A protein has these predicted regions:
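Generic "edge-of-domain/loop-turn" microfeature
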Residues: 37, 64, 82-84, 134-136, ...
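A generic structural signal for short beta-strands and their flanking turns/coil linkers
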Residues: 53, 71-73, 121-123
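Hydrophobic, proline/glycine-rich low-complexity stretches
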Residues: 1-64
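Weak global preference for isoleucine
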Residues: 10, 30, 38, 42, ...
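Context-gated lysine
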Residues: 5, 15, 82, 111-112, ...
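Internal, well-folded beta-alpha domain core
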Residues: 27, 87-176
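Hydrophobic/aromatic-rich structural module bridging two neighboring secondary-structure elements via a short loop
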Residues: 61-107
Length: 176
């Protein structure tokens, strides 16, 4: 396998990349409210805090047909530009070069290299993201009340679950 690809090899790569699939995802996500001043301090110029100053931290792992298995996490901030409200991706952390390149180089996602892990034992979950030896996200949760299938775009409802009760939580963000 060399750096120069045949037309057939390029066509096979284009076919795989044109239909990316991310399956078997496991994610631990926590939403929490903060103050508009904190949100304003971390948003880039041109964005304002959304009506609700919400921050989301997530740790997870995925399988895919285009970047193999990978793990990572992300921090999202509810933001507004003019009359459009959406989640602004403050940072994404991935544990493989393929996952970083696929999102960053093709779509401009703010991906960085980091280590992460997500484990569970019964209803107890622990997920973290670490970069250069610094723990950036650390979520511990006991998920005891299953509220049924989540309505997540692109996720099969038979396997996406969301829970109400989180009994322990530590979220640390380093913003440099």
């Amino acid at each position: 396998m060399g750096f120069v690809k045949t037309r057939e090899e390029v066509a096979r790569l284009e076919k795989v990349l044109s239909r990316p699939r991310f399956v078997g995802a496991e994610m631990l996500t926590i939403d929490y409210l903060t103050t508009p001043d904190i949100v304003r301090s971390i948003l880039p110029p041109g964005l304002e805090p959304a009506e609700e100053p919400l921050i989301t931290a997530m740790v997870g792992r995925w399988r895919s047909n285009c970047v193999a298995d990978f793990a990572g996490g992300a921090i999202y901030v509810a933001a507004r530009h003019k009359n459009i409200e959406a989640a602004y991706v403050l940072a994404m952390f991935m544990d493989t070069d393929q996952a970083i390149m696929f999102g960053r180089d093709l779509f401009g996602e703010p991906k960085k290299r980091a280590t992460s892990d997500l484990r569970h034992n019964g209803v107890s979950f622990h997920g973290y993201v670490e970069r250069f030896g610094v723990r950036l996200i650390d979520i511990r949760a006991e998920l005891t009340t299953d509220l049924g299938p989540a309505t997540v775009q692109g996720a099969p409802t038979s396997t996406s679950r969301h829970c109400r009760r989180v009994t322990a939580l530590a979220v640390k963000m380093i913003l440099v």
